[in-house]
């Protein structure tokens, strides 16, 4: 008699579990949609958040410049919410991938700023998974895919300052510190070394942010001011609105007529779809351009900068605003990495 083992029940159980798991992951009825990208997103963002909070509070000083002069960024080392930061990885590490097992010990890993790479890489991949999850959820619901396209703007902006710029400059120590004052320091140093304020791509980004804020405020105020009254005068207008109602809740023709007469006729949209596409496209495209500008400057490709001095036919300098900006940049460069070199490369 042969010894036999019936595997059908085992396979059926496995398939049943796997089917239930897939059904739960891909269900659009859950209070929080998970999706395939969510399996990657949730642990990555949790790890990045926990590591960031722990480093912001407890991390020891980091030898950011690679000259054995560590800089403290944690709250327990005397910083406050404004001055605290997760300090970028040491210049001695460069752009090498630096997980904890590459160091001789945990203390050395902390001293060389390994937490910065840990937080940044987990965050970028987690945010990328979030963008993929937006596409996946839209696909499941039969929606058009423009939500994840819009989110690509902040994602590429973060990738530019946290990944592309350090790679282009040859060291993660040139990445943006993860803190408030560290962000401002990064901006000043970036201006000193690249004069980004004079770059047209950065100007497009400024127009995107301030223009987007203006358009958002204009749109919100116009809609709120042209709500259709469905209630008596002594009741709130909000009571007359039912979630999911098919009838429009505000008069776009009234808003269009008001704004067209306030500015001029063609400054106002009479098509709701065109209006909302414009509100989405304006800031997204501008942030794309800014990210492209940062990414090109990462490799010192500054050819689009309008910072050249003006010289007359005799070779004499004609003082201009570009010279004032260049002089200010040199002043900021002198303050940067003050112990790593005596003079900035521009003056050496």
UniProtKB/Swiss-Prot annotation:
UniProt GO MF annotations: chlorophyll binding; electron transporter, transferring electrons within the cyclic electron transport pathway of photosynthesis activity; iron ion binding; oxidoreductase activity, acting on diphenols and related substances as donors, oxygen as acceptor
Membrane topology: Multi-pass membrane protein
Compartments where located: Plastid, Chloroplast thylakoid membrane
Residue positions binding pheophytin a: 130
Post-translational modification: Tyr-165 forms a radical intermediate that is referred to as redox-active TyrZ, YZ or Y-Z.
Site feature: Tyrosine radical intermediate: 165
Residues at which [CaMn4O5] cluster binds: 174, 193, 336-337, 346, 348
GO cellular component, as recorded: chloroplast thylakoid membrane; photosystem II
Residues holding a quinone: 219, 268-269
Cofactor annotation comment: The D1/D2 heterodimer binds P680, chlorophylls that are the primary electron donor of PSII, and subsequent electron acceptors. It shares a non-heme iron and each subunit binds pheophytin, quinone, additional chlorophylls, carotenoids and lipids. D1 provides most of the ligands for the Mn4-Ca-O5 cluster of the oxygen-evolving complex (OEC). There is also a Cl(-1) ion associated with D1 and D2, which is required for oxygen evolution. The PSII complex binds additional chlorophylls, carotenoids and specific lipids.
Main location: plastid
UniProt keywords, alphabetically: Calcium, Chlorophyll, Chloroplast, Chromophore, Electron transport, Herbicide resistance, Iron, Magnesium, Manganese, Membrane, Metal-binding, Oxidoreductase, Photosynthesis, Photosystem II, Plastid, Thylakoid, Transmembrane, Transmembrane helix, Transport
Catalyzed reactions per annotation: 2 a plastoquinone + 4 hnu + 2 H2O = 2 a plastoquinol + O2
Feature type site, description Stabilizes free radical intermediate: 194
EC number, UniProt record: 1.10.3.9
Binding-site list for chlorophyll a PD1: 202
Membrane-spanning residues: 33-50, 122-137, 146-160, 201-222, 278-292
Binding site for Fe cation: 219, 276
A Gene Ontology biological process term: response to herbicide
Pfam families in the cross-refs: Photo_RC
UniProt miscellaneous comment: 2 of the reaction center chlorophylls (ChlD1 and ChlD2) are entirely coordinated by water. Herbicides such as atrazine, BNT, diuron or ioxynil bind in the Q(B) binding site and block subsequent electron transfer.
HAMAP family according to UniProt: PSII_PsbA_D1
Family: Belongs to the reaction center PufL/M/PsbA/D family.
Known role: Photosystem II (PSII) is a light-driven water:plastoquinone oxidoreductase that uses light energy to abstract electrons from H(2)O, generating O(2) and a proton gradient subsequently used for ATP formation. It consists of a core antenna complex that captures photons, and an electron transfer chain that converts photonic excitation into a charge separation. The D1/D2 (PsbA/PsbD) reaction center heterodimer binds P680, the primary electron donor of PSII as well as several subsequent electron acceptors.
Protein name: Photosystem II protein D1
Organism of provenance: Heterocapsa triquetra
Gene: psbA
């Amino acid at each position: 008699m042969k010894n036999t083992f019936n595997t059908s029940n085992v396979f059926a159980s496995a398939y049943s579990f796997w089917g239930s798991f897939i059904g739960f992951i891909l269900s659009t009825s859950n209070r929080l949609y998970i999706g395939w990208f969510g399996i990657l997103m949730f642990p990555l963002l949790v790890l990045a958040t926990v590591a960031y909070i722990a480093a912001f509070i407890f991390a020891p000083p980091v030898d950011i410049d690679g000259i054995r002069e560590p800089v403290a960024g944690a709250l327990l080392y005397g910083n406050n919410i404004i001055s605290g930061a997760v300090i970028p990885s040491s210049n001695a590490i460069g752009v090498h991938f630096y997980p904890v097992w590459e160091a001789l010990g945990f203390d050395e890993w902390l001293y060389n700023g390994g937490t910065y790479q840990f937080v940044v890489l987990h965050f970028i991949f987690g945010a990328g998974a979030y963008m993929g999850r937006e596409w996946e959820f839209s696909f499941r619901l039969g929606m058009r895919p423009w939500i994840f396209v819009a989110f690509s703007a902040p994602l590429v902006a973060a990738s530019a300052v946290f990944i592309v710029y350090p790679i282009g400059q040859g060291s993660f120590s040139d990445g943006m510190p993860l803190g408030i004052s560290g962000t401002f320091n990064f901006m000043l140093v970036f201006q000193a070394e690249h004069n980004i304020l004079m770059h047209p791509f950065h100007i497009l980004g400024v127009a995107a942010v301030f223009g987007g804020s203006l358009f958002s405020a204009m749109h919100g105020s116009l809609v709120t001011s042209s709500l259709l009254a469905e209630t008596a005068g002594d009741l709130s207008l909000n009571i007359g609105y039912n979630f999911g109602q098919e009838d429009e809740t505000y008069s776009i023709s009234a808003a269009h007529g008001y704004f067209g007469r306030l500015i001029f006729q063609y400054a106002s949209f009479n098509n709701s779809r065109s209006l909302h596409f414009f509100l989405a496209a304006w800031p997204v495209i501008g942030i794309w351009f800014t990210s492209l500008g940062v990414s090109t400057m990462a490799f010192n490709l500054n050819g689009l900068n309008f910072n050249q001095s003006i010289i007359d036919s005799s070779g004499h300098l004609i003082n201009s605003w570009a010279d004032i900006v260049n002089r200010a940049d040199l002043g900021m460069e002198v303050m940067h990495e003050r112990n790593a070199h005596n003079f900035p490369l521009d003056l050496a």
